């Protein structure tokens, strides 16, 4: 069984943790036993330090938009080369909480950084490495931000304006529309409905990969 890299994407408050649990349950019901979880930015000692800078910023210096995106790609290549690729080579399935699509949407859409620059960075840093499947949890930014506020204090990016997240969502939607490996899930529904949609979409994809549910034999 070939290992796969599955990524969960979406705005703040989209329900990525719930989605991850559904993905794991579905994978295990199809016989996948070894699963590794990653998050971006983060996942290695260096990447975690960069995560803190990206999320919290600095008290005495502004983090510029280009510095932010360069830190994101530095953290990403550390994670991909030191964790994700070795895990895949070892036969593990990897479930990522965010990957490159986040940079294309947040920095490209939200920040307005040139898309060609972002694609050039992606291709230079990651080569042709891409997720096998991305589940994009789509919901209106106002709903997501309300959920995020209920979790507690907002980080530097979560404190951005509603217009920022509107631009980010628009870019997410455009990217999902042009890439068959990105499946869009309506995350504004109830938890049960979202879970059912994720499970159905993932089961169909797994069947396309040649994986069927494991039948439990009763004695």
Swiss-Prot record:
GO cellular component terms, semicolon-separated: cytosol
GO BP term (any one): dTDP biosynthetic process
Molecular function per GO: ATP binding; dTMP kinase activity
Enzyme nomenclature, EC number: 2.7.4.9
Recorded catalytic activity of this chain's protein: dTMP + ATP = dTDP + ADP
InterPro entries: P-loop_NTPase (IPR027417), Thymidylate_kin-like_dom (IPR039430), Thymidylate_kin_CS (IPR018095), Thymidylate_kinase (IPR018094)
Cross-referenced CDD domains: TMPK
Superkingdom per UniProt: Bacteria
Keyword annotations of the record: ATP-binding, Kinase, Nucleotide biosynthesis, Nucleotide-binding, Transferase
Record: residues binding ATP: 10-17
Family: Belongs to the thymidylate kinase family.
Role description: Phosphorylation of dTMP to form dTDP in both de novo and salvage pathways of dTTP synthesis.
Protein name per its UniProtKB record: Thymidylate kinase
Organism: Pectobacterium atrosepticum (strain SCRI 1043 / ATCC BAA-672) (Erwinia carotovora subsp. atroseptica)
Gene that this polypeptide is encoded by: tmk
């Amino acid at each position: 069984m070939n290992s796969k890299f599955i990524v969960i994407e979406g705005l703040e408050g989209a329900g990525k943790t719930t989605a991850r649990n559904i993905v794991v349950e579905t994978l295990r019901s199809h016989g996948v036993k070894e699963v590794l979880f990653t998050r971006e930015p983060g996942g290695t000692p260096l990447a975690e330090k960069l995560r803190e800078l990206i999320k919290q910023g600095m008290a005495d210096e502004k983090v510029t938009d280009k510095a932010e995106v360069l830190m994101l790609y530095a953290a990403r290549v550390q994670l991909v080369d030191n964790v994700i690729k070795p895990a895949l080579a070892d036969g593990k399935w990897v479930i990522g909480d965010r990957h490159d699509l986040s940079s294309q949407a947040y920095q490209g859409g939200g920040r307005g950084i040139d898309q060609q620059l972002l694609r050039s960075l992606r291709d230079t840093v990651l080569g042709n490495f891409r997720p096998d499947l991305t589940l994009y949890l789509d919901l209106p930014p106002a709903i997501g931000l309300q959920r995020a506020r209920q979790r507690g204090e907002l980080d530097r990016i979560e404190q951005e304006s509603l217009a920022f997240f509107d631009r980010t969502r628009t870019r997410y939607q455009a990217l999902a529309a042009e890439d068959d490996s990105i499946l869009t899930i309506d995350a504004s529904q109830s938890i049960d409905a979202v879970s059912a949609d994720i499970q159905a979409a993932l089961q169909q994809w797994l069947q396309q990969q040649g994986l069927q549910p494991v039948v439990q034999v009763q004695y």
